[in-house]
A protein has these predicted regions:
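Amphipathic cytosolic juxtamembrane alpha-helices at the membrane-cytosol interface
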Residues: 90-105, 109, 129-137, 187-191, ...
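Transmembrane alpha-helix signature in integral membrane proteins
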Residues: 43-44, 92-127, 281
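C-terminal transmembrane helix and the adjacent membrane-cytosol boundary/short C-terminal tail
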Residues: 172-173, 219-227, 268-301
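Periplasmic/extracellular loop-to-transmembrane helix junction in inner-membrane transport proteins
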Residues: 29-36, 63-111, 255-275
Length: 301
């Protein structure tokens, strides 16, 4: 059986290839734009390295991060222990490597939760207005009026210590800025001519929201979420420092600083190295967020 070049099967395959080529070209162009900004490239590279380290932690870490060796306690950085050891003789480099998994777990889980939640509440408030807007925005104002770390601390204190409770607490404090941003975007789009035209064609409110307004709000929301990731890392580290995050002996970066602060004057590496890990990764997400803003939001130029 032969297939004509003009058959629907052939034309469909050709259209599929063209779509793939266009998508690949857009991806290459997007990466090229990011690479032209040195800080964005550095931030993206650090985050990519963090992902690789978290995925291949068992292959990268030379020691078990939980096994204690009191004979090697508080050893300074050397060829055997690159970043030294803590007060229990555990290799700090190995604990940092495995701690990257905890950090990414919190960041990714909070981000995929607060994004849809904030977007849903924000576009609903901006589009429907009236009492819906008033109620949702007053609730948002209540959450925003408290510092995020203080509010997260209150939620974790109520829920109890633990990694899952930290995720819930940070989620409850991270959605309000996204909701306000989505509301502002929706207010600017609600009276646009093309939205009025869609309504005149008989489109329902749900169709207008999900097919027209939400896609236009996504770039700003993605940028905000990316820049929020640095705050998520710092909040998680703060809760871990206070003993409310991942519980010992889990290698959470904030908890590592807390347990090593007693020895920080004599053994600087116990506190300094986890602190640098938090600082570098927070800056990386900020750099990446700035680059995404320049690419996805032309109004920022």
């Amino acid at each position: 059986m032969t297939v004509s070049l003009d058959s629907p099967l052939s034309s469909g395959a050709g259209e599929g290839r063209q779509r793939l080529q266009r998508a690949a070209a857009r991806a290459v162009g997007f990466v090229g734009k990011m690479a032209r900004n040195p800080l964005t490239a550095i931030g993206g590279g650090i985050i990519f390295l963090l992902l690789v380290v978290a995925i291949f932690a068992p292959l990268i870490a030379p020691y078990n991060p939980l096994v204690q060796d009191l004979n090697s306690a508080l050893v300074a950085p050397n060829a055997q222990h690159w970043f030294g050891t803590d007060e229990f003789g555990r290799d700090i480099f190995s604990r940092l490597v495995y701690g990257s998994r905890i950090t990414l777990y919190i960041v990714l889980l909070v981000s995929v939760t607060v994004g849809p939640l904030g977007l849903l509440l924000g576009v609903s408030a901006g589009y429907f207005g009236g009492k819906v807007d008033m109620v949702l925005m007053r609730v948002t104002d209540i959450f925003i009026s408290f510092p995020s770390l203080v509010l997260a601390l209150a939620f974790v204190a109520a829920l109890g210590p633990g990694l899952e409770h930290v995720v819930i607490a940070i989620t409850l404090t991270a959605w309000p800025p996204i909701a306000r941003l989505a509301r502002a975007e929706t207010l600017s789009l609600r009276q646009a001519d093309f939205i009025s035209a869609v309504r005149l064609q008989g489109a329902s409110s749900a169709r207008v929201l999900w097919r027209h307004i939400v896609p236009l709000c996504l770039p700003s929301v993605i940028i905000r979420i990316t820049m929020n990731m640095a705050g998520i890392i710092l909040t998680a580290a703060g809760l871990g420092f206070l003993g409310l995050g991942a519980q010992p002996p889990e290698p959470e970066w904030g908890a590592m600083i807390s347990s090593g602060r007693t020895y920080m004057m004599e053994c600087w590496w116990v506190v300094t190295i986890p602190g640098l890990a938090i600082l570098i990764n927070s800056l990386a997400f900020n750099f990446l967020g700035d680059g995404l803003r320049d690419i996805l939001d032309p109004r920022s130029e």
